Amino acid sequence: MSRIFILLLLFGVCLAWTSSDLEIFRVVDSLKSILKNKATFYELLEVPTKASIKEINRAYRKKSILYHPDKNPKSKELYTLLGLIVNILRNTETRKRYDYFLKNGFPRWKGTGYLYSRYRPGLGAVLVLLFLLISIAHFVMLVISSKRQKKIMQDHIDIARQHESYATSARGSKRIVQVPGGRRIYTVDSITGQVCILDPSSNIEYLVSPDSVASVKISDTFFYRLPRFIVWNAFGRWFARAPASSEDTDSDGQMEDEEKSDSVHKSSFSSPSKKEASIKAGKRRMKRRANRIPLSKNTNREN
């Protein structure tokens, strides 16, 4: 933790402006407030950006005569700034810094210090940046936790193998090892070399292997889980309804099949009664016809 704090402190120191930078910013702001046309140091002296020191001194003599307070009392502030500007351009380091800010842009005064205003990230950019930083930190924590668990597993294996000579008994190819002064009981397989932790109460062995620790995947990180959580809460309902609807249709189909089978059974049970009714009706017709025929013969004989 202390190392991280020191790194952040050094990073903040590197980002801080130097005294020469602050002096350049003050002179630039003062020049803009006086001239109102955002003139550069080179434009004020009327020299090119690659002018030599001799050319700068020559231009300074001309401008100092022009803006001298004795000749022009209103240009007293500009005359003092002219001396500061020439001193900045005469020094190689301060001139490089001025040329750098002239090319990339000068920071603006924001209450307590000079801050860059060329790019102001919006809320979306800030949230994306925070999301990426949190994802990276979460990934690093998962990797550290995985390595720590593997190290713990390896430590158990080393302890069991170091004290293998203290084995009290054996189970076939496995030797039971109890560390002196320790509470854990290990079993070491003399053939495969596997080390297990033995629970004496339940007599269950738990395999100790660094390979059993799952490796860190992208799907385990915050970078994957948060978008998945949002998408699932937003659109998961529609995906969840599809299987339910199919189950409903299946259940409806089963109900229809059951109803059909019931109707078939009912029809099979009801069909004999219909046959019996038709047979009875046929017998009645036969009786009627049989009764009618003798009557007609008797009447013919009498005639």
Swiss-Prot record:
One of its GO terms (biological process) is protein folding in endoplasmic reticulum. InterPro entries: DnaJ_domain, DnaJ_domain_protein, J_dom_sf. Residues 247-260 have a biased composition (Acidic residues). Residues 17-123 are lumenal. PROSITE patterns: DNAJ_2. It is found in: Endoplasmic reticulum membrane. Residues 244-303 are annotated as: Disordered. The keyword Cell inner membrane does not apply. It comes from the Eukaryota. Residues 1-16 form the signal peptide. Pfam families: DnaJ. GO terms for cellular component: endomembrane system; endoplasmic reticulum; endoplasmic reticulum membrane. Keywords: Chaperone, Endoplasmic reticulum, Membrane, Signal, Transmembrane, Transmembrane helix. Residues 40-102 form the J domain. The chain crosses the membrane at residues 124-144. It is a single-pass membrane protein. One of its GO terms (molecular function) is Hsp70 protein binding. Residues 281-291 have a biased composition (Basic residues). Residues 145-303 are cytoplasmic. Belongs to the DnaJ family. PANTHER family: DNAJ HOMOLOG SUBFAMILY C MEMBER 1 (PTHR44653:SF2). This is Uncharacterized J domain-containing protein C2E1P5.03. It comes from Schizosaccharomyces pombe (strain 972 / ATCC 24843) (Fission yeast).
